[in-house]
A protein has these predicted regions:
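Active-site microenvironment for binding and transforming phosphate-containing groups
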Residues: 1-119
Length: 119
């Protein structure tokens, strides 16, 4: 944790076919209300700081920043299949992927993300 980033892992998911993690807010560059590791572009934070925070997390976890795909929560019914053109507008509450490589993410506050996997 030399970079200050902490990622929580569930013992229930360890050893399975998927890598998983739940990053804490430590180790980032954002300031003020969104201080430290803010990963969301939609909450008024400096866009460059969010990009750098995402890059820090990617380096910490060993994946390419371009592989990170996250939901754009709108409390709707749209699902995006990673690799296909983004919907217009690019708003969707679900992600589907049928190939290895992409890192899928979801933001959650009072909403609970539901994660399914089929190796």
């Amino acid at each position: 944790m030399a970079d200050g980033i902490r990622v929580l892992r569930s013992p229930l998911l360890e050893g399975g076919p998927f890598v998983h993690g739940f990053p804490e807010r430590t180790g980032g560059e954002s300031q003020g209300l969104r201080a430290s590791l803010n990963l969301g572009y939609r909450w008024g934070d400096d866009q460059e700081l969010v990009r750098r925070n995402r890059a820090r997390l990617a380096e910490h976890e060993g994946f390419a920043l371009d592989d990170l795909q996250v939901t754009k929560h709108v409390h709707g019914v749209n699902v995006w299949k990673v690799g296909e053109p983004l919907p217009d507008p690019p708003e969707f509450d679900g992600l589907v992927c049928d190939r290895p490589g992409p890192v899928l993410g979801a933001f959650a506050a009072d909403c609970v993300p539901i994660l399914f996997g089929d190796p």
